[in-house]
Amino acid sequence: LGLVGTLFSFHSIFRLGNFRKGNITFICLWLICAAMTGMYILKHTKTINQADELHWQQAYEEKYRTAYQGVAQPSVTHIQTTIDLYPNEMTYQVSGSYQLVNKTDQVIREFIVHTWQDIQMQSLRSSNLSQIKMDRAFGQYVIKPAKPLMPKDSFSLHFTFRYSVNPWNGHNPANAIVQNGSFIRLSNYFPRIGYQSELEITDESERAKRTMPAATSIKGLTDAMEQPYPYGFIRWEALVSAPAEQTVVGIGELVKRYRKNDRTYFHFDSKRPIPFRFGLSSAVYEVKKTQHDSIAIEIYYHPRHAQNVTHLMERIKQ
């Protein structure tokens, strides 16, 4: 409607003979502003259609599947990370380190690390590197340790990345950093070791059109686990900071909570190995607490969403 109204105004100016110097200046300024606004939106909008995504998936698979699927890669055994949440700016910052172990019976001379294109990868480094190559098109790093990793050898890998919400590309519910109610499935965005079969095209007819071989099969619930499983289980330690008024709920035992420089810090430690699946939420919560068989139980909830809290507490005790 705004565009129609503007065009009608332009038509009226010309039709009624109100074509003065001031009108010309106004029209020129309006056109310049419209062009600059359009360019800004285009620059910040990720315009990837389905065809582009399918081409990307095919290219990734063709480049990395044969070369790295089934090839010995190190396993993540321990993650230490610091995560700073800035919900008012809709952004968060992560620094972390992986302890990698060669759990195979083969020598590992190089391995690959996949990073996600939604995040801003800032660094990937180690003191034990001879070479690192980045494939920017696929967010892929090819890493060669200074010395080949013999069976049971370990390797430390350090990384930093940042994520900021792009208002032009919609809301991702698994990566939501918002003012009061953040939820981040962190394991979706941390670097991954090895070939990522979940990035393959899964539609059989689409693969047939592209003359691609069968996709990597998904293991059933009763299938034997790959040994060693690519991630097995990990020890997880995280220091998470958030605005002072917010509470962070995360994976592991809350070892310590303290305030510093108008922010609240939460130190989580899994204490024992957990699957490579971890996340957190942060908001201003109400808390309902109780003790049951010497076990502390706490439920964090939005003050206006308390309808089933008592029922939930009773179910937990059972």
Segments from the language model and where they lie:
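N-terminal, polar/Ser/Thr-rich
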Residues: 1, 15-91, 208-212, 226-230
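Membrane-embedded alpha-helical segments of integral membrane proteins
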Residues: 1-12
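Extended, low-hydrophobicity, Ser/Thr/Pro/Gly-biased non-transmembrane segments
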Residues: 57, 160-277
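Short acidic/proline- and small/hydrophobic-mixed sequence motifs that coincide with surface turns
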Residues: 91-92, 106-108
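Juxtacatalytic substrate-recognition/specificity segment
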Residues: 94, 141, 158, 238, ...
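Asparagine-centered strand-capping/turn motif at beta-strand->loop junctions
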Residues: 99-105, 115
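Aromatic-lined ligand-binding clefts that engage carbohydrates, nucleic acids, or primary amines
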Residues: 110-118
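A surface-exposed beta-strand-loop module
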Residues: 119-180, 224-228, 262
